[in-house]
Amino acid sequence: MTAETLRPPPPAPAPATPGPRRRRRQPWRRALRRDWQLYSLAVLPLLFFLVFRYLPMIGNVIAFRRFSPGGSVFGEYWVGLRYFRLFLADPTFWQVFTNTLVLGTLTLLFCFPLPIVLALLLNEVRARRLKRFVQSVSYLPHFLSIVIVAAMVMQLLSMDGSVNQVVRGIGGEAVPFLQQPGWFRAIYVSSEVWQTVGWGTILYLAALTTIDENLYEAARIDGANRWRQTWHVTLPGIRPTMVTLLILNIGTFMAVGFEKILLLYNPLTYPTADVISTYLFRLGFESSNFSYAAAIGLFEAVIGLILVLGANTISRRTVGTSLW
């Protein structure tokens, strides 16, 4: 047995004493320090939403309290679900609720797909001047005030308007379009399409520019025609934009177009034109029934929230794209 085998093993090194822990900065703090100038631009919009959108939500408490003008801001005494039971038993509410669903559905069916179709058609146009002209003509109505658009519609469809002049010219009789309930939905949806389709087209044209041209080249090599390229390359390429805009449109489904409807409708067209927002306006500002109007408005907001959450969940599970 040698001396090396009898030598004891060397002592283990002493564990290093841990130094003072260095606090790791949070990623959002680091980003805030680096890009504070950009984040500062969001201060005013956030204040706007806080002051004019979120703080007024506190006033929804009057849906559960008896409110009288000149009294307490939060109502005089608690009434619970009394106003909710009242409007659920009111046949007028269900009429305006049905009108809201019908107008919202028609608006979504026409105003959502038409910008996609127009963007796909313009994407195939190779003449730049023609393309720019069509783009300008289509999206300029978006910048017109709703008051101006409503005035144009009333001028065109009046008894002495251009449309009735054409009707008389072909041997027909003048039609009181704005006084007949059966015409209101077509008038509203067509004016909404004319005013909004161009702006949506610009968004989809911007999304089309992000599609890799190599995908089209590979599709052509595989023998795909223009229709198959559109179906298998173009539409999947703009799917995130389509889903985002669809969810945003569903978010405004219950609101429909309060200003335009308020300007175009009249008591003769109430059976098809009166929606929840205009009904609330009459209840709150003409009848001074603020608690009843607040209850209906809260119900409308809850339905809209459910629609947005449902659309986002379905989109995430079916196509894998969602807002959050």
Per-region residue spans from a language model:
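A structural signal for multi-pass alpha-helical bundles of membrane permease subunits
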Residues: 31, 37-324
